[in-house]
Amino acid sequence: MAEAQIDSQLLDGARRALVRHGWEGATLQRLADEAGVSRMTLHRRGVSREALLAALGEQLEHEYREAFWPALTAPGTALERLELALDSLCDVADRNLELMEALGHAERDLVFHERKRPALTKQVFTEPVQRLLADGVADGSLAVEDPEETATVLFNLVGHTYRHLRAGHGWSPKRTRKAVIDLALRGLVAR
């Protein structure tokens, strides 16, 4: 079968359908309705729910890469740049809060986790954090034994906790960022 033809109109519609109906309720008909196309158009373009999920995952990968870039290229210690990266992670989480809440665990796993078990978070999401952790070990600002594993822990610690406190507890972005990032960084600072 040919690769699905998914444009920004379909992705935006998929986001709306997922937010409104959740993954289980986001039928192809609802996805088509939210995108302003017919279900037959989705069929002709080779679009399935799974293809839309994969495309949304690619969109998230791009958003995280773009968000982390300034922290990778900024001046300062690795600790300062890591704080900037974690703040950027919170920015992406805020922009995608409703989408992430609408996806089930299995769908989030497909987007973020490696397939093997035990799994790390996909490198496309954690590689920038891993780089900053390794830089911190090199410049003495961070105490980290395994940057690769710590990057997965940190990405998930900040991402999940931030999302939960924002969506589940109704905390403001400012309050949540300070609480989560300060706590996460305290465990990494070289003493």
Regions found by a protein language model. Name each.
Residues 5-9, 13, 17-51, 55:
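Helix-turn-helix
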Residues 55, 69-95, 150-154, 174-177:
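Hydrophobic alpha-helical connector segments
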Residues 91, 123-138, 156-157, 163-191:
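C-terminal peripheral helix-coil segments that are non-catalytic and often amphipathic
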Residues 3-6, 10, 147-154, 173-177, ...:
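Short amphipathic alpha-helix in the helical subdomain of ABC transporter nucleotide-binding domains
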Residues 13-17, 88, 92, 157:
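Short amphipathic alpha-helical elements of helix-turn-helix/winged-helix folds
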Residues 93-113, 167:
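Amphipathic alpha-helical segments used for helix-helix packing
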Residues 62-65, 112-139, 148-152, 163:
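Amphipathic alpha-helical packing segments from all-alpha helical-bundle domains
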